[in-house]
Amino acid sequence: MQPVRHNGRVSGEVKIVEAAGAVLYRRNTDFQGWLKFSDDGRQTSAASRLADFDTLEVCIVHRPKYDDWSWPKGKLELNETHRHAAVREVSEETGVPVALGPFLGEIEYPLAEEGKKTRRSKDRTVDTKHILFWMARPIDPEDAVRRADAFGPVHRADVGEIDSVMWVSVQCARRMLTHSTDRDILALFVDRVEEGALDGDMLLLVRHGKAEPRKQWTGTDDKRPITPRGASMAYSLDRELACYNPTRLITSPWLRCQQTIQM
């Protein structure tokens, strides 16, 4: 029996619902911090990395239907990518406009276990939910307005879907998260923070859209343009890049690269 992946529609004998979400984090600027010093009075090298968690808060949501605390997430809409769904769903469920950071990981569990505390079944013969997770950070409302045309509409979730949103410490989230799989994602988030993810900047490398074949192009290679198919690819790329809220775009001087960015 072969599973068929889809965006929430029944297809074949086994249904795999694709979904996406994120661990939304922020700094608690009101926290005064803990002093971590060695015996000689100098701050230890490990203290600076551990101190990241002193001021760090993550966002969890309560779903009244299941009476559970979980990460903001949701199913993909028709023709939607996981990246776009992650940003849209987190923004809709928390009311906070966000941008994606590093990819964290994925979880999978039978749909029948939705809302249950333990979700570790690997039965491939039952309907399944498959979820990808990223790190995400809040962005300014002005940035959200600026990217709105590229990203598309975001509609706040109603109270019947999400009735409470809380910012809590990592330690508190570990206690409050209802599901074992969500705690697995939290562990991956902690690993990324310990690796220095909060101190890094996002760099995206993007290939140009489909260009005219070299064998058919009679001009110089730097003037070889994108095709109508390439223009369509470039247009759809706009929505994907908006998920990361880039602040600067740099392109090669070659025409096909410039056309990809300009679309």
Across the structure, where does each feature detected by a protein language model lie?
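Short His-Asn-centered micro-motif
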Residues: 72-73, 80, 251-253
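Unchanged
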Residues: 76-179
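N-terminal strand-loop-strand
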Residues: 2-71, 203-208
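Short acidic, glycine/proline-rich loop/turn micro-motifs
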Residues: 70-74, 113-116, 215-220
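A generic fold-level signal
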Residues: 15-17, 53, 126-129, 160, ...
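Short, structured interface segments
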Residues: 168-197
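Active-site loop signature of alpha/beta-hydrolase-fold enzymes
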Residues: 66, 106, 212
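Active-site-proximal alpha-helix that buttresses catalytic centers in soluble enzyme cores
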Residues: 200-263
